[in-house]
Amino acid sequence: MPPMLSGLLARLVKLLLGRHGSALHWRAAGAATVLLVIVLLAGSYLAVLAERGAPGAQLITYPRALWWSVETATTVGYGDLYPVTLWGRLVAVVVMVAGITSFGLVTAALATWFVGREQERRGHFVRHSEKAAEEAYTRTTRALHERFDRLERMLDDNRR
């Protein structure tokens, strides 16, 4: 991408998001992470309640249920632990959605941070290049004006 175009895009993104656009992403990612931890803890507890006493249930202790909720939220799903009751499966759906959403927000915040850093770097390069080009243009213009002034003086001197 040409530097001028990337600089324009960087300015456009900064204009749209403002200075606090990146902070907004980090706050959303932080809130999603806190919510995920709450869902993991509550989901583990609810899974134990839902699964306790069911035939073939494996999620009958809190530590096992907590491990299962982390597996489920991260979409690893080893398959070693799984709910067997309807209520346990509904809890699993909530844990899955919370995990997928939270990891998506954190990933988006990280990507925004990396892209923002690169855009800022390119924007600085573009501003520096534009300033250097403007200074060169000004010097060239002044030199041309001086030459034209000299030529006009020479023509005036020759006419006299």
UniProtKB/Swiss-Prot annotation:
Keyword Ion transport: yes
Extracellular side of membrane: 51-61, 81-87
Cytoplasmic side: 1-27, 112-160
Compartments in which it is found: Cell membrane
Residue intervals passing through the bilayer: 28-50, 88-111
Residue numbers covered by motif Selectivity filter: 75-80
Effect listed in the UniProt record for changing residue 71 to A: Prevents channel inactivation
Alphabetical list of InterPro entries matching this protein: K_chnl_dom, VG_K_chnl
Additional remarks: The amino acids 62-79 are situated in the membrane and are important for channel structure and properties.
GO molecular function annotations of the record: identical protein binding; voltage-gated potassium channel activity
Statement: the UniProt record of this protein carries the keyword Transmembrane helix: yes
Family listed: Belongs to the potassium channel family.
Consequences of knocking out this gene: Cells grow slower and to lower myceliar densities.
Record keywords: Cell membrane, Ion channel, Ion transport, Ligand-gated ion channel, Membrane, Transmembrane, Transmembrane helix, Transport
Intramembrane segments: 62-72, 73-80
Notes on the domains: The cytoplasmic C-terminus is involved in the gating mechanism.
Record Pfam families: Ion_trans_2
Gene designation per UniProt: kcsA
Recorded topology in the membrane: Multi-pass membrane protein
Name of the featured protein: pH-gated potassium channel KcsA
Gene Ontology CC terms: voltage-gated potassium channel complex
